[in-house]
Amino acid sequence: MAITKEDVLEFISNLSVLELSELVKEFEEKFGVSAAPVMVAGGAVAAGGAAAAEEKTEFNIVLVDSGDKKINVIKVVRALTGLGLKEAKDAVEGTPSVLKEGVSKDEAEAAKKELEEAGAKVELK
């Protein structure tokens, strides 16, 4: 039986952020491409400025620094992301790292507060 696009999309949607990042790197190496965003023409930037004035609804949680209490930060990262111990440790030690993408403002702020209480420095982008 052949694998369909839906099967591939279902598989990808079940990957963790760390696994997805590794998959993107493998695609870049295998096919010689880059996942970097394409430069936008000057006219489109002016139009995008109006959209940026609106309040942002989706945020990425970026761990900037794990601080002195790495074990506490790893525990919080595991609880927030569902990552295994090794993946969470790699994310904490490999800062800066994106822990979650496209989350609501409330979820992002709650995660930031929890991580900062554990001793980490976090940015919401």
Curated annotation (Swiss-Prot):
A molecular function GO annotation: mRNA binding
GO biological process, one term: translation
Pfam (any one): Ribosomal_L12_N
Keywords from the UniProt entry: Ribonucleoprotein, Ribosomal protein
Gene3D superfamilies the record matches: 3.30.1390.10, Single helix bin
NCBIfam families from the UniProt entry: L12
Function: Forms part of the ribosomal stalk which helps the ribosome interact with GTP-bound translation factors. Is thus essential for accurate translation.
Name recorded for this polypeptide: Large ribosomal subunit protein bL12
